[in-house]
């Protein structure tokens, strides 16, 4: 799956070979912001392990051969009844903000998750983050609620806003989500 998004920019499925670049993009979010609630940045090997789920795709944006952002999906919760709901995340490299990479990544991730058969996508956004909220609103997510003061990092309590997007109608007997490699073109 490689889709040109615009001249010089492409979106593709992430591979384990991308783990170092993805970890490098994520590291400043972990070390200097409350956007991620992790307190220690994962090393390359840990990032590669996170990418291994056959049901939860990761995408990367490449500009002129350099990875400038990624979008990931993960189980919303581990209990089986949640398996039609998926959590999404997007991270863009420092210096690459404001150029549409987040929008392209999240749009393509939503397309893939929909094709897999997921019914609901959830984004958990640490507040304040008006840029992320605006992006999610533009892509059809709606506010579903806010957890107040649920994370303490960098000396501050942080609220988390939950955003939800329906990907498919809710049916009485939903089909199991498909592995992403079966539907990625």
Question: Can you annotate each of these PLM segments?
Answer:
Residues 39-95, 106-107, 166-167:
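Acetyl-CoA-dependent GNAT
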Residues 23-49:
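Conserved GNAT-fold acetyl-CoA-binding loop/helix
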Residues 113-125:
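Conserved GNAT acetyl-CoA-binding A-motif
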Residues 9, 66-70, 158:
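Glycine-rich phosphate/pyrophosphate-binding loop shared by adenosine-nucleotide-utilizing enzymes
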Residues 98-112, 134-138:
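Conserved acetyl-CoA-binding loop-helix of GNAT-fold acetyltransferases
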Residues 10-24:
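A short beta-loop-alpha structural element at the N-terminal edge
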Residues 72, 122-125, 137, 142-159, ...:
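Conserved catalytic-core motifs of GNAT/GCN5-like acyltransferases
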Residues 97, 123-133:
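Conserved beta-strand-loop-alpha-helix junction that forms the acyl-donor binding cleft
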């Amino acid at each position: 799956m490689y889709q040109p998004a615009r001249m010089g920019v492409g979106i593709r499925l992430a591979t384990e070979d991308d783990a170092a670049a993805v970890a490098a993009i994520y590291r400043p979010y972990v070390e200097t912001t409350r956007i991620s609630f992790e307190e220690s940045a994962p090393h390359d090997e840990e990032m590669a392990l996170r990418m291994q789920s056959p049901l939860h795709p990761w995408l990367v944006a490449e500009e002129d051969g350099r990875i400038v952002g990624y979008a990931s999906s993960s189980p919303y919760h581990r209990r089986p009844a949640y398996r039609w709901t998926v959590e999404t995340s997007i991270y863009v490299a420092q210096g690459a903000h404001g150029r549409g990479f987040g929008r392209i990544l999240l749009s393509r991730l939503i397309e893939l998750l929909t094709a897999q058969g997921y019914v609901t996508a959830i984004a958990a956004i640490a507040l304040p983050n008006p840029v992320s909220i605006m992006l999610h609103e533009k892509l059809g997510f709606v506010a579903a609620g806010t957890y107040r003061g649920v994370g303490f990092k960098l000396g501050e309590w942080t609220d988390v806003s939950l955003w939800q997007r329906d990907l498919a109608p809710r049916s009485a007997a939903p089909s199991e989500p498909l592995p992403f490699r079966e539907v990625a073109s």
